[in-house]
Amino acid sequence: MNRGLYGKLAVNNIKHNRQFYLPYLLTGMLTVAFFYTMLYLNHNPGLDELPFGAMDVELVLGLGAVIIGFFSVIFLFYTNSFIMKRRKKELGIYNILGMEKRHLAKVIFLETFFLAVGAIGGGLVAGIAFSKLMCMLLYAMIGYHAEIVFYVSESGVVSTILLFAGIFMLTFIYNLFQIQLAKPVELLHGSSQGEREPKTKKLMAIVGIVTLAAGYYMAITVDNPVTAVILFFVAVILVIIGTYFIFMAGSIAVLKFLRKRKSYYYKKKHFVAVSGLIYRMKQNAAGLASICILSTMVLVVISSTVSMYAGLDDELAARYQGDIGVSITSENPITEGDALRELVNRTIQQENRSIKEEQGMMTLTFSCISEDGNLVIRKHDDEGSYSSDIIMLRMITREDYEETYNVTVPELSDHEVVLATSDDYDKDTITVGDYTYSILQKQHFSSENGHWMDNQVYYMVVNSVEDMAPLYEAQKEIYGKNASSYYYSLYIDIDGNREEKIACGNAVSAAIGASGMEEGHDGKYYIMIENRAENEDSFRQMYGGFLFLGIFLGILFLMITVLIIFYKQISEGYEDKERFAIMEKVGMSNEEVKKTISAQIRMVFLLPIVTAALHVLAAFPMIRMILAVMNLNNGRLFAYCLLGTITVFTVIYLLVYKMTLRTYYRIVGRQIG
């Protein structure tokens, strides 16, 4: 054959199937543009000039590039397999007319090559053209003000070309195998082959229910933030497996159950809808499950990142209790704490700043093992000590507790305490080591704030620092060099603008360093200094990076979801066209056909979004605890962000439904009346 003929055939085939290839090409270009943009921003030299958080932002953007690359493989393979199924009849005709499979392979290679050049080239042009705009958007989100210089990331271009050229090459190899293994007759009928009625897979349905229930159980019953972080990905995997298995096996079981109910099944609209869904449910189920999982990802990613960014002020307030924070770990807390406080106050006055509010707090925190309601001081590697049994006991003076937590505590005598816990401690006394204390009052606080990493915290309020001494000595004797010391923290709010507060904080740090206190006395104490205004930039940059990534990934997942829905509707339309023509011939009116179509499409479309909403609601407690690790304890804010995300996504989803419904009707030869 003439070599030029292969190229003409490839171009004509793409034009002839433009209703399939145009969405594929456009979304491929967008995916390429997204991937390049992430690499461009990650390698942007301007980010290296960030005073704080440059590593955090670059890490977030690098993670985004990996995620986009991973889903690009899945997305391009899915759409390619759909298009190839629709084109098998066309390729079969070429084969019958005399083209050998090696000739078909050359045509498909050129088609893949042209599509790859269009997607990669167009995507890179779009990515480069809008790179400066994306950089401006990122800088705005992270609160960074700097001149943006236009440049092309050579490493980003090379990495993008290599990745997507590899993906398109893999799709070509997949298509080649499909042609080589198929017979001419199979190619002729490939696009019209429906799914055989699947068998009821009871084991798969049971496994799906069990795994989904297990994932829900983990998400709902998790009781501390670190466990939530550890179990999150396990729960996600279980829910994904459960979703696919239930859609593929459970849905078939339900449809067959409905078919057995003669009073329900033998009605025109139910008969056609149920029998049609059963006939090809295996193919539908995988697509519906994919739509459900992608919808869930959109809801979780966008709601989480938006709430993190919107709650930044709350997170900073929880993390930093003052403009300047100074803490000292010491064996002589009163003497060294007073000296530190005097030095900090003197330095602030020298900087001509006024103290608006000052709060100091002395605590002693050490771990114990809970045994029958008693707290035993014992090393954690001893036999019988488990993480779930560890209690972090935090002792605090009555005066500091009232001032810090704005609560009232009654007068305490010797061996009397106030106990604050997140659980229901029901005893009137508490024994710690060899010491027993009467509980004068019990207080309860939110379990969200009641954990030290993955262990529970008990706050034990005593009259004075001297009342902490017996337990300080007891834990020191047991833990030796790993024993806890007294911890004195000082938080001060000062007047002035941001720059003045940063300068004052730096002056305090310099004064402590010059005094020699920072080095400690024979290593017996350690000082930590925090400057809220200075560290705020780092938080804003990190959370702004997360928001930017969340929006990018949300758009990507939404785009993939829309394309899967679009191709699914086209596939359904072609498969149903002949079937509904037969239904009209056997007596169904045009109106009855339209009602049947609408009922079936509504069921197919609503099932994924409803299931996705259930997934997100079940995951709410776990996600909220994960956000608590990042100091976002405003559950109401997260709930509002989640509700808003669900609302906006549902509106977009319904618009896609309306658009694809029209496409479906055009294919089957009906108009929406």
PLM feature spans:
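Hydrophobic alpha-helical transmembrane segments of multi-pass inner-membrane transport and secretion
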Residues: 19-46, 55-92, 113-126, 206, ...
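Short cytosolic juxtamembrane segments of multi-pass membrane proteins
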Residues: 3-8, 181-195, 574-575, 665-673
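Basic-flanked hydrophobic alpha-helices used for secretion and membrane insertion
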Residues: 315-329, 335-559
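Short helix-loop junctions at transmembrane helix boundaries
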Residues: 40-51, 55, 124-156, 213-231, ...
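N-terminal Sec/SRP start-transfer signal
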Residues: 1-32, 197-202, 211, 247-295, ...
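Hydrophobic alpha-helical segments
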Residues: 114-258
